[in-house]
Amino acid sequence: VFAGKVTPKDSIILMIAFGLGLAIPALILFLLAFFRYKIEGHDDVAKLTKLPIIADVAIASDRAKTKADIVVHENQNNVMEEVFRSIRSNIQFMLKEDQKVIMFTSTTSGEGKTFTAANLAVSFALLGKKVLVMGLDIRKPRLTNLFELKDKNIGITNLLVHDNPTREDICANILNSGVNRNLDIMPAGPIPPNPAELVSRESLDNIFATLRKEYDYIFIDCPPIDIVA
């Protein structure tokens, strides 16, 4: 009878160690990917939504606050202007002739939707198109500050409280942007206690029907979807 010490073969130990060395990192990566809930880039959006991606805006203001955040200017060729020119061209190619209204939203506040809407609107205005930016982010409006508009009491909330605002009422709540004569702004206006109820009113459809006759494009700065939800 052999009573000596029995040990596994070195080759078996190496194989087990090699297998664990591959399996454990792979398991960790799988779990990280499985439980990841954040959209982190272009590829994630393309994979999850199956929607066409018009462009990537790589650099944006955290919160569009003043005219310094307007990066598109006439007779200038900076990097951001090229980005918005590319977006403009893609949108023009995609839209049909009667499609005039474009909505801008984001997953949460501070992602740059107002920045994008404002600068794209300037880009279209520089083409000679008559453009309106409408502020429907009523809880946290930024258009008035972004374009440094003087009258804080003008805006769409003044219209939504009426069932059928007239053309004169609508025009009275529109201001020129001060950036380009082809670009007008309809700010959010005074913040009401019930913004969700206001934007659900039928009067909003009547406002759009009037504005479609006046403008080539209407850009809507909407609230983030987490606030809507």
Q: Where do the language-model regions lie?
A:
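Conserved D-loop-proximal element of ABC-family nucleotide-binding domains
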Residues: 194, 228-229
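Conserved Switch II/interswitch segment of TRAFAC-class P-loop GTPases
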Residues: 222-227
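Conserved beta-strand segments of the P-loop GTPase G domain that flank and frequently precede/overlap
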Residues: 103-105, 187-188, 218-221
